[in-house]
């Protein structure tokens, strides 16, 4: 892969969609669609991802995850306000994770990509992943396609696509941002929702829960999913999480649900448990 590098002054430490590293400006391949968010220190995970994508000869790039030392500067690019006080609802690690996803949405727009596939670095890929990561099978009005098999949903209004898969409208909340596609239309839509606002909710809760309330938000699930997180496949020996300690630290700061919200949430939980079906991985 060809990487263009030019020297720049230090005050341009971080720009979108290019990344300043050791005095150099790293230009991402404008034709690349597959990006894996990963801390530079997570060499075990990076080795796993290189092997996983290599099995199917799938091209990809690592996106160096936003770290706590640059989250303030990165947030300013989008006029996002952060709470890093003792009462913060997100840890610095969770903020960096969310900003990493947001920067990639912006990268898609800046590089005029018609879509971008975003992954986290603990996934396993399923069959026909290479073909299914060429996103030419969803309608033009779709914002987000979830690729990951995670949780239950209602399988209604199926649309048959390639490799014996279907896509279904997502109508109930999901968790996890380990594998999903954002279209150009979706990148613009998501950025408009997060710019000029506080960031106090984890990125997966935004994309696969909070934004579902907007009637014009078009999001679909690929089923069977083509990726799954390591802890789902290997619950007894998963990759160690770099975010869990921070999550535990801010857990007590989360907003308490009202009685009405608790009733509504419980009703939804029972409904999905009784009538929902697990998204399969293949």
Swiss-Prot record:
Keywords: Glycosyltransferase, Transferase
Organism: Haemophilus influenzae (strain ATCC 51907 / DSM 11121 / KW20 / Rd)
Record-linked InterPro entries: Glyco_trans_25 (IPR002654)
Top-level division of the source organism's lineage: Bacteria
Name of protein: Putative glycosyltransferase HI_0765
Enzyme kind, highest EC tier: transferase
Family according to the record: Belongs to the glycosyltransferase 25 family.
Pfam families given in the database record: Glyco_transf_25
């Amino acid at each position: 892969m060809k990487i263009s590098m030019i020297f720049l002054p230090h005050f341009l430490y971080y720009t979108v969609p290019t990344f300043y590293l050791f005095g150099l400006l790293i230009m991402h391949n404008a034709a690349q669609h597959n990006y894996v968010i990963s801390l530079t220190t997570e060499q075990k995970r990076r080795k796993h991802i290189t092997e996983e994508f290599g099995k199917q000869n799938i091209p990809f790039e690592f996106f160096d995850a936003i770290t706590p030392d640059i989250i303030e500067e990165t947030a300013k690019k989008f006029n996002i306000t952060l709470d890093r006080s003792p009462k913060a609802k997100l840890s610095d690690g969770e903020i960096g994770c969310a900003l990493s996803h947001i920067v990639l949405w912006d990268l898609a727009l800046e590089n005029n990509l018609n879509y971008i596939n975003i992954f986290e670095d603990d996934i396993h890929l399923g069959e026909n992943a290479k073909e299914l990561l060429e996103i030419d099978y969803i309608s033009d009005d779709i914002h987000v396609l979830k690729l990951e098999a995670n949780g239950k949903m209602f399988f209604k209004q199926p649309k048959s696509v390639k490799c014996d898969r279907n896509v279904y409208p997502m109508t109930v909340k999901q968790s996890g941002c380990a594998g999903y596609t954002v279209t150009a239309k979706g990148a613009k839509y998501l950025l408009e929702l997060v710019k000029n606002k506080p960031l106090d909710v984890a990125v997966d809760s935004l994309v696969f829960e909070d934004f579902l309330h907007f009637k014009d938000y078009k999001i679909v699930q690929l089923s069977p999913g083509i990726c799954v997180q390591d802890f789902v496949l290997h619950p007894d020996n998963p990759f160690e999480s770099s975010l869990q300690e921070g999550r535990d630290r801010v857990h007590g700061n989360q907003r308490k649900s009202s009685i009405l919200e608790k009733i509504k949430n419980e009703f939804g939980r029972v409904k999905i448990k009784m009538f929902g079906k697990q998204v399969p991985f293949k």
